[in-house]
């Protein structure tokens, strides 16, 4: 299913739809998501903007971000055979049966992009029989909604405690950080930090 995401009268930056995905996960080793962007008849939007794909957890109705990307400048993703590839195996428990997906592109023009999303369920020996996801923090409604570099962070609760059950065999932390926003401090050449900076740390205490 291809969706035109754009900004203006009668247009929308987001789309929510339900899909019937693979049912039996017993022999699924990994899941790959492919995000393809094509140019509308008027051409693609000229700017690189924040975009993501989310899946709804059916019990809590919470949205979990399964992939984030930055759109290319004024072109599509045809240089990539199937589009932008994202490994979404961590979200195996949410990508089975009938699922609700949300796509968002923070585009400010009526041109926008034609978006399609595809999944590959790769058969093999799963590393674990069961998967579980716990949200630590999520600030991804738009490009400026998150923790901005160099600015006051007192309004954010950045200390989180996670409890693990006795039957947990392995856990890992998944972070998606795009560094958007042109925030301070500037570098030695006077340029403000944006997606070009790699300034983040994660401290874990047992």
Q: Which residues are covered by each model-predicted region?
A:
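Extracellular/secretory-pathway and virion-surface proteins
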Residues: 1-206
């Amino acid at each position: 299913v291809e969706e035109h995401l754009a900004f203006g009268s009668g247009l929308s930056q987001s789309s929510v739809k339900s899909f019937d995905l693979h049912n039996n996960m017993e022999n699924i080793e990994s899941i790959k998501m492919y995000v393809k962007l094509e140019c509308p008849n008027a051409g693609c939007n000229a700017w690189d903007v924040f975009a993501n794909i989310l899946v709804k957890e059916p019990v809590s109705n919470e949205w979990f971000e399964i992939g984030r990307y930055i759109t290319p400048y004024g072109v599509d993703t045809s240089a990539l055979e199937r589009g932008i590839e994202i490994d979404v195996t961590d979200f195996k428990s949410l990508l089975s049966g009938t699922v609700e997906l949300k796509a968002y592109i923070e585009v400010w023009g009526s041109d926008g992009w034609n978006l399609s999303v595809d999944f590959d369920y790769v058969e093999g020996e799963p590393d674990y029989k069961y998967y579980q996801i716990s949200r630590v923090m999520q600030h991804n409604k738009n490009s400026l909604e998150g923790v901005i570099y160099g600015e006051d962070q007192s309004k954010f609760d950045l200390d989180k405690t996670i409890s693990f059950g006795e039957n947990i065999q392995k856990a890992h932390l998944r972070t998606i950080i795009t560094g958007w926003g042109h925030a301070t401090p500037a570098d030695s050449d006077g340029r403000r930090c944006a997606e070009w900076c790699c300034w983040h740390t994660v401290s874990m205490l047992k």
